[in-house]
């Protein structure tokens, strides 16, 4: 693949960025020197993986107040890390960032890109973006925005990711010429603001050099990638209380909610039909003197690969059974500080609101299913 010289083509982009760049809390004031705080760049780049800038900013500020440097994060407990990350999603990022901080606090910052790539959670894009912004290394960082900018500028046919190696070689001299940090962030800024999926070509600093714009093909370059249809699921999410506290699922090492506490739940497809009879009769059939069953309107919780229809409910027991397998009773005062994902945090927040809706027969059947898992004895 023969590509035109990137140095003159991208020169207007660097100047444009100096004039319009957004004031983001992790950006250095001086883009001609190494970043004064590489840790801040690391945190921002990990948070920005699959999360929009506007969402990241408040989380970044809170994070830097609580864990202002590598040593503070490395010394933190896992629960503290997950609690501060709660709500940002993709929780594996928090675990990897914690592990990376421990390695960096112990060994110091690597001296090359391969060393950054060896850190937990740093793939080719994140490592290259960190290298360029923090250390002024001319390492091309190619994410969705950068691929889109390059594909339109050069009128690349097909998926530009297939040309990743050629694009890195094309960009590297321009990074060295215009400043790695400045040009890397300029490409990010252009892709996020003007060269978005629906582009605004009028004010674009690269309009005169853009082949896709000249050829009237910006709407077709790059081609839209088909997205997998998320799997559908329906579940009953239950906050069950007793004199000993709340019944919860402790964090696991892997899976969708790894590192987080969650409420017990039952898949709707695993419950029998509600059948005949009254809600009062169904509640009376529950063990352990169940009282005060409540529910709230449900919602749809969306993950990258999954859509969950959630039916939230709560139930208070008069006595405390043994915790079913995989669950644990947690004292009431500990509940607010537990790290939870958005779905479970939402039910925790609902507990503070009064509900006039009783827990219906299906919800009560779900509670029975949770409590029927080998309750060996009362505590």
Language-model features and meaning:
Residues 1-28, 34, 192-379:
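Intrinsically disordered, low-complexity, charged terminal extensions of DNA damage-control enzymes
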Residues 4-7, 12, 16-219, 230-232:
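Catalytic cores of DNA base-excision repair glycosylases
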């Amino acid at each position: 693949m023969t590509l035109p010289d990137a140095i003159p083509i991208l020169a207007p982009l660097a100047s444009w960025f100096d004039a319009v760049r957004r004031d983001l809390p992790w950006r250095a004031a001086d883009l001609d020197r190494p970043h004064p705080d590489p840790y801040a760049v690391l945190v921002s780049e990990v948070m920005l993986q699959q999360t929009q800038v506007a969402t990241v900013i408040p989380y970044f500020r809170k994070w830097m107040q609580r864990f202002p440097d590598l040593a503070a994060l490395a010394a933190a407990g896992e629960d503290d890390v997950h609690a501060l990350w709660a709500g940002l999603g993709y929780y594996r990022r928090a675990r990897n960032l914690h592990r990376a901080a421990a390695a960096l606090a112990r060994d110091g910052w690597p001296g090359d890109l391969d060393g950054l790539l060896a850190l937990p959670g740093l793939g080719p894009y994140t490592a290259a973006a960190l290298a360029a912004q923090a250390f002024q290394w001319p390492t091309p960082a190619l994410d969705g925005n950068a691929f889109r900018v390059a594909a339109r500028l050069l009128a690349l046919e097909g998926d530009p990711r297939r040309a990743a190696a050629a694009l890195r070689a094309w960009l590297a001299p321009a990074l060295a010429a215009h400043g790695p940090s400045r040009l890397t962030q300029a490409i990010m800024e252009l892709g996020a603001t003007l060269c978005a999926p629906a582009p605004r070509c009028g004010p674009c600093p690269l309009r005169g050099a853009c082949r896709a714009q000249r050829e009237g093909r910006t709407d077709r370059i790059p081609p839209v990638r088909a997205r997998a249809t998320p799997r559908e699921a329906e579940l009953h999410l239950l906050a069950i209380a007793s004199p000993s506290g709340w019944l919860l699922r402790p964090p696991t090492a892997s899976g969708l909610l790894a590192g987080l506490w969650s409420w017990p739940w039952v898949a709707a497809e695993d419950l029998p039909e509600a059948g005949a009879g009254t809600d009062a009769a169904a509640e009376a059939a529950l063990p352990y003197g169940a009282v005060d069953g409540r529910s709230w309107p449900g919602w749809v919780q969306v993950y990258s690969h999954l859509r969950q229809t959630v039916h939230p409910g709560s139930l208070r027991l008069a006595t405390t059974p043994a915790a079913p397998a995989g669950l644990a009773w947690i004292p009431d005062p500990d509940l607010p500080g537990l790290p939870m994902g958005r779905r479970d945090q939402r039910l925790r927040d609902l507990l503070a609101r009064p509900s006039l809706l009783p827990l219906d027969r299906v919800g009560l059947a779900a509670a029975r299913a949770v409590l029927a898992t080998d309750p060996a004895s009362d505590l």
